[in-house]
Structures are given as C-alpha cells and as structure tokens.
C-alpha cells in the first residue's frame, strides 16, 4: 500500500440524533466536533440522521402507506387483474 494517499482509519463516534444513541466504531470520517466516550477518551463525533437503531427496516416498524388511494386509483384506471 502506498504511503500518504490513504485517509486515516481511526475510532469515531457516530451519534444517531433521531434515537439519541451513539456507538463507537472505526472509520475514515473526520469531524471538527469531539465527544468524551465512556472509556474516558475523546473521539471525533459524526451526527447522523438515521442508523440501524432508528431506521424502520431494522426496527420492524416499517409501514406501507397508500397515500391518496393510489393503488385503488390504479386499479380503477387499469382494472384489477387476477393471476400471478
């Protein structure tokens, strides 16, 4: 591996703002902001809007929303077909 061309891979805290949850992992992300972690060390912190803690797919709260009856409108327009 060539020296000097790769970003630094280091511990970083990712903070999920929606779920008020933070986790420490390794990444090449950088940040001006820092946070003191449970082990007493200071790490860069990256705020994220969605993580595995708050995403509906991972939490099991996913819902299918039929906004404005689009499925019914489609079926009226093109007819509901039986089959596969």
Swiss-Prot record:
Pfam families: Ribosomal_L31. InterPro entries: Ribosomal_bL28/bL31-like_sf, Ribosomal_bL31, Ribosomal_bL31_B, Ribosomal_bL31_sf. SUPFAM superfamilies: L28p-like. Keywords: Ribonucleoprotein, Ribosomal protein. One of its GO terms (molecular function) is structural constituent of ribosome. GO terms for cellular component: ribonucleoprotein complex; ribosome. GO terms for biological process: translation. Belongs to the bacterial ribosomal protein bL31 family. Type B subfamily. Part of the 50S ribosomal subunit. This is Large ribosomal subunit protein bL31B-2. It comes from Streptomyces coelicolor (strain ATCC BAA-471 / A3(2) / M145).
């Amino acid at each position: 591996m060539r020296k000097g061309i790769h970003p630094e891979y280091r511990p970083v805290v990712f903070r999920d703002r929606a779920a008020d949850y933070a986790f420490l992992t390794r990444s090449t992300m950088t940040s001006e902001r820092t946070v003191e972690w449970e082990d007493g060390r200071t790490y860069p912190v990256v705020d994220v809007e969605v993580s595995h803690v708050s995403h509906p797919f991972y939490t099991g709260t996913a819902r299918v929303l039929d906004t404005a009856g689009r499925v019914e409108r489609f079926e009226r327009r093109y007819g509901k077909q039986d089959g596969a």
